[in-house]
Amino acid sequence: MPYTKKKPIIIVDGSLYLYRSYFTFQNFNSNEENPSGAIYGMLKTIQNILNKNYNSKKIIIIFDSSKKNFRNTIFKEYKSNRSAMPNKLYVQIQPLFKILEEIGIKTLSILGIEADDIIGSLAYKLEQKGEQVLIVSHDKDMIQLITDNINVLNISKNSILTPEKIQEKYGIYPKEFIDLLALMGDSSDNIPGVPKIGIKTALFLLKKFSNIKNIYNNIEKIQSLPFRNAKNAAIQLKNYKKTAFLSYQLAKIKLDVPINITSEEITLKKTCFKKLSNLIRWYSFNE
């Protein structure tokens, strides 16, 4: 069971786990008027997070807002491949927020700001204050935020991602993951990337040139490099330069969103664990 020796502040990717909870417990409650599977799933997820990180006393859960953000402005197709939120999930959101408030767990969403940007900005701000941060998410976008003081917990795989683990797996630094997504694209967010540039080619180029800016500064050298289809890759990069840099803007998580959260707001009260357990038990009995 992974846990960190210090006491990190936990930032949960609430939108991600809200959807996951909804689909996992879609048939949890057959009551058409008051579905509760997403609520139950979120409470179980929070309990699991706190059990795995029992030495942490500060937690905040971040959610997307319904309003579009700057990425939709610069690229209208951003996330356009995603279906609208199911109504059975939508009706559980406000009740969930009220329940979390009763328990004493802080939530945050900001109109027109994507959850990823809130998470990144808050994590960066806390790191600047000397805090250790643990982001709970299995979204690959979060990899770019990883530092010695900001780690990412994937509760499904029971693993904590660190800079060393990212370098071991990909051979690049976490911050270069933005460039990786810019080159190869990201179908889940509908980020285009450069067509026909896959992960192997992208990683080869980043290991040699570090970032897309440096790749384009050395664009004439690429066709002669020792990797498969180097000539075709060079042509694709030249033809889709604007798309590559647009994709970089879409993939890069903002670190400068103004966030005013006090330490007291995110500190768990002693009654939190009991309230959480009681609610989970109540939902289990009333399923």
From Swiss-Prot:
Pfam family membership, one: 5_3_exonuc
GO biological process assignments: DNA replication, Okazaki fragment processing
Intrachain disulfide bonds: none
EC number in record: 3.1.11.-
Keywords assigned: DNA-binding, Exonuclease, Hydrolase, Nuclease
InterPro entries associated with the record: 5-3_exonucl_a-hlix_arch_N, 5-3_exonuclease, 5-3_exonuclease_C_sf, DNA_polI_H3TH, FEN, HhH2, PIN-like_dom_sf
GO molecular function, one term: 5'-flap endonuclease activity
Highest taxon in the source lineage: Bacteria
Domain 5'-3' exonuclease as annotated: residue spans: 172-270
Function in brief: 5'-3' exonuclease acting preferentially on double-stranded DNA.
UniProt xrefs under NCBIfam families: PRK14976.1-2 (NF011545)
PANTHER family referenced in this protein's UniProt entry, alphabetically: 5'-3' EXONUCLEASE FAMILY PROTEIN, FLAP ENDONUCLEASE XNI
Protein name, UniProt field: 5'-3' exonuclease
Organism name: Buchnera aphidicola subsp. Schizaphis graminum (strain Sg)
